[in-house]
């Protein structure tokens, strides 16, 4: 039997998600606050002892013009992946919410490696189908990431596992006078400017400054803005990271077109990894890379940069969709892909030269 999380049971829910090995910041109520255009709900299932043993947070948003909604359980569920009965009850709760909100699909992208074919088969038995896509960044969340196991390791042990050139670049940045500070919202404008520069340089759409400022507000102590400064105090790179449960995630990164020879990005990564060590985390997650690791892929440089820190290349099972209205699903999914590509082209044209 499932239950919907209420204001009264929210602290218990948050404690469960934070402590579970499959816990993820995207399943937190705090992340729901970061997405005010979405309706946030959470479903829980309790064991015989009365404690929560499984949960699924879903966000629902209206699709303009069709009177239906998209339901999305980002990086859910949070439960024992072998517990079919618990997942079945969580899905019952999601279906009830989908009926209430007139959702045309229930979409999930679990924190589950692609090698777990048993879980994929279980999802398929419930009617989920794999969302086909490319190997780059076509999905909502990255399917391919690098993850570094930091559990029980010292900084010296982690450094020893880095590629020697990466260790050299970290020390070079320090020798050249690069400093990294944890900053507040006063540095958001500078970070957003660096994000815009990076987006135009690398060909992706970036967020507005308000989004990053709200992240620091909504996630509080769970979020950090790291800024790197050159020897005269000019901001030359920055990152946004999230610590939740036993993981730290590298969420956003940006850098100037100048002073790249000072290697600020290497030092920024090391500072975030140190945060994971300081907070006794199990995993430092570098987040997305391309699944196409051929050297002629324009995204290969990003892959190589993250690979050099000694993490494990991880492929998730990807987006899984439970289609509730096939005709609307086809129309929306096709239209969304076309719109995203058009928006990207317009954005890059408008910001070229800024």
PLM features per residue range, with description:
Residues 2-49, 53-67, 110-118, 126-261:
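A conserved beta-strand-loop-helix scaffold within acyl/acetyltransferase catalytic domains
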Residues 40, 100-103, 278-281:
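Short, high-confidence coil segments that cap the C-terminus of an alpha-helix
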Residues 59-60, 124-153, 282-354:
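Active-site/acyl-donor-binding loops of N-acyltransferases
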Residues 73:
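Flexible glycine-rich active-site/ligand-binding loops centered on an Asp-His dyad
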Residues 76-82, 260, 264:
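The substrate-binding groove and active-site-proximal loops of carbohydrate-active enzymes
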Residues 78-130:
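A gly/proline- and charged-residue-enriched helix-loop-helix capping module
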Residues 88-97, 213-217, 222-330:
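Aromatic (often tryptophan-rich) hydrophobic motifs at membrane interfaces
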Residues 104-109, 181-183, 283-285:
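A structural signal for short, well-ordered beta-strand segments and their strand-loop junctions
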């Amino acid at each position: 039997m499932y239950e919907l999380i209420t204001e009264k049971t929210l602290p218990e829910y948050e404690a469960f998600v934070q402590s579970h090995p499959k816990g993820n910041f995207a399943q937190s109520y705090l992340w729901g606050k970061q997405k005010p255009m979405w309706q946030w709900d959470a479903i829980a299932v309790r064991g015989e002892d009365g404690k929560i043993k499984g949960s699924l947070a879903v966000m629902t948003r209206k699709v303009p013009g069709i009177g239906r909604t998209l339901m999305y359980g980002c990086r859910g569920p949070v439960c024992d992946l072998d517990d079919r009965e618990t997942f079945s009850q969580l899905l019952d709760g999601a279906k009830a919410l989908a009926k209430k909100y007139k959702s045309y699909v229930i979409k999930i992208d679990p924190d589950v490696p692609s090698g777990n074919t048993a879980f994929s088969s279980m999802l398929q038995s419930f009617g989920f189908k794999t969302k086909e896509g490319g190997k780059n960044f076509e999905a909502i969340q990255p399917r391919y990431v690098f993850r570094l196991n930091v559990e029980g390791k010292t900084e010296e042990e982690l450094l020893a596992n880095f590629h020697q050139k990466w260790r050299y670049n970290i020390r070079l940045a320090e020798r050249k006078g690069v400093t990294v500070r944890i900053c507040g919202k006063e540095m958001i404008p500078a970070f957003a400017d660096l994000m815009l520069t990076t987006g135009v340089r690398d060909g992706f759409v970036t967020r507005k400054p308000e989004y990053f400022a709200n992240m620091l507000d909504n996630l509080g102590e769970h979020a950090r803005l790291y800024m790197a400064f050159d020897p005269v105090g000019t901001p030359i790179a920055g990152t946004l990271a999230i610590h939740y449960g036993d993981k730290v995630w590298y969420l956003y990164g940006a850098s100037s077109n100048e002073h790249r020879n000072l290697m600020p990005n290497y030092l920024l990564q090391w500072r975030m990894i140190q945060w994971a060590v300081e907070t006794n985390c199990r995993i430092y997650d570098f987040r997305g890379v391309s699944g196409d690791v051929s050297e002629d892929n324009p995204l290969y440089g990003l892959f190589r940069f993250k690979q050099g820190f000694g993490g494990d290349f991880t492929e998730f099972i990807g987006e899984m969709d439970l289609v509730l209205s096939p005709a609307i699903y086809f129309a929306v999914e096709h239209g969304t892909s076309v719109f995203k590509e058009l928006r990207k082209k317009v954005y890059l044209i408008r910001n070229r030269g800024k």
